[in-house]
């Protein structure tokens, strides 16, 4: 007999859709004892949230998140709201005994994150943060190769996440669609939005980051705010680049911008070790590029592993070898790991929880502090 986990989703935008798709797909492709049930969705616009509930198969809807988290027929709450509300909603969920699945980043800053971690760990409630890219098969394969020690000593890690959607000066800030440009709602710009993904993956694969030296730039200093209709200062970072040192002694370069004309979502990382190197590109997400210095010189060169075989992480749960997976599958994979953990609570967690996400938040905080001070900044331990 399957054990139902009744989900309450708060927010029905881009992430609300991706998470809802994962809830709908999980039981078709992964055999877990606990299964999600789409119980309720919450949004402020009654007409829109009702339509979303009907389209995605939620049994009911609310227009006030406070009412949703108090409902006795909700077991777990999925927070898909702007960053400034994560902490408040999560703390209310904990008071009401709800499991939490929270969008990234964990909070606006480390101080908020600490409060969330302290409360959720005291409660013992299962908790997850949606850092999804690590659950793409090729990325998980990279982690497995590094963990097996195949690279030897790691020397370098580099990552970038490039977009171009905010170049126009006519683009306003704030509101439902553009809250990422409003510091009050987002906390930061590309650092918390895009680099947080790069940092999470890097820490997962290569260990903790101990210090950073960063620079940021806001290219357009003022934008019309949708709430007031008047021009206001833009205080988020449009671009950020930083150097980093890992605990294992390796060096790193990270870069992110929303001003790289021609790039819609270019996320790449590369790891260089004494024996092997690995590289990955979101645009070719099913492939992991692999260089092995140990093969004979006349056979040496970069090769591509098509991570769609049944032996590759997660791929065997889907189609036959050679058929590709996409961005949306990463959310189903993360959800599968969460539900496997509910099935076996004593097993090692294979997904990012609040404490791991707090470590990423600390790196983001250090990056912003370094950019402001112009100095190297040590990263707080989570």
Regions found by a protein language model. Name each.
Residues 31, 60-73:
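Short acidic low-complexity segments
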Residues 133-234, 288, 374:
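Predominantly a Rossmann-like dinucleotide-binding segment in NAD(P)-dependent oxidoreductases
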Residues 62, 102, 127-129, 158, ...:
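Hydrophobic residues in well-ordered beta-strands that form the structural core
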Residues 196, 255-264, 323:
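Glycine-rich phosphate/pyrophosphate-binding beta-alpha loops
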Residues 1-56:
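N-terminal Rossmann-like dinucleotide-binding module
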Residues 211, 221-237, 241, 245-246, ...:
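C-terminal glycine/acidic-rich active-site capping loop/insertion
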């Amino acid at each position: 007999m399957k054990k139902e986990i009744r989900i309450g989703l708060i927010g029905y935008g881009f992430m609300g859709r991706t998470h809802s798709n994962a809830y709908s797909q999980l039981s078709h492709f992964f055999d877990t004892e606990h299964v999600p049930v789409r119980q309720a969705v919450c949004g402020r616009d009654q007409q829109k949230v009702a339509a979303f509930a009907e389209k995605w198969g939620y049994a009911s809807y609310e227009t006030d998140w406070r009412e949703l988290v108090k409902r006795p027929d909700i077991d777990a709450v999925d927070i898909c709201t702007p960053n400034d509300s994560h902490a408040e909603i999560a703390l209310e969920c904990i008071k009401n005994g709800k499991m939490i699945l929270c969008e990234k980043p964990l909070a606006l800053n480390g101080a908020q994150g600490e409060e969330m971690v302290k409360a959720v760990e005291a409660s013992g409630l299962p908790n997850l943060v949606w850092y999804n890219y690590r659950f793409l098969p090729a990325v998980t394969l990279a982690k497995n190769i590094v963990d097996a020690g195949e690279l030897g000593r790691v020397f370098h890690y580099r990552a970038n996440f490039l977009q171009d959607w905010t170049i126009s000066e006519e683009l306003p800030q704030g509101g439902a669609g553009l809250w990422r440009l409003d510091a009050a709602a987002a906390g930061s710009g590309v650092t918390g939005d895009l680099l947080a993904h790069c940092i999470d993956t890097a820490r997962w694969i290569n260990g903790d980051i101990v210090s950073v030296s960063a620079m940021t730039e806001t290219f357009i200093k003022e934008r019309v705010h949708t709430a007031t209709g008047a021009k206001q200062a833009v205080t988020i970072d449009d671009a950020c680049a930083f150097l980093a040192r890992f605990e294992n002694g390796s060096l790193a370069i990270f870069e992110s911008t929303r001003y790289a004309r021609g790039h819609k979502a270019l996320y790449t990382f590369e790891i260089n070790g004494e024996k092997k190197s690995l590289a990955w590109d979101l645009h070719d997400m099913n492939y992991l590029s692999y260089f092995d210095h140990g093969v004979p010189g006349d056979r040496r060169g970069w090769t591509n592993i098509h991570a769609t075989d049944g032996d590759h992480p997660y791929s065997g749960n889907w189609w036959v070898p050679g058929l590709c997976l996409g961005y949306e599958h990463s959310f189903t994979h993360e959800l599968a790991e969460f539900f496997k953990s509910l099935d076996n609570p004593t097993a090692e967690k294979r997904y990012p929880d609040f404490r791991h996400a707090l470590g990423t938040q600390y790196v983001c905080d250090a990056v912003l502090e370094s950019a402001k001070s112009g100095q190297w900044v040590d990263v707080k331990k989570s």
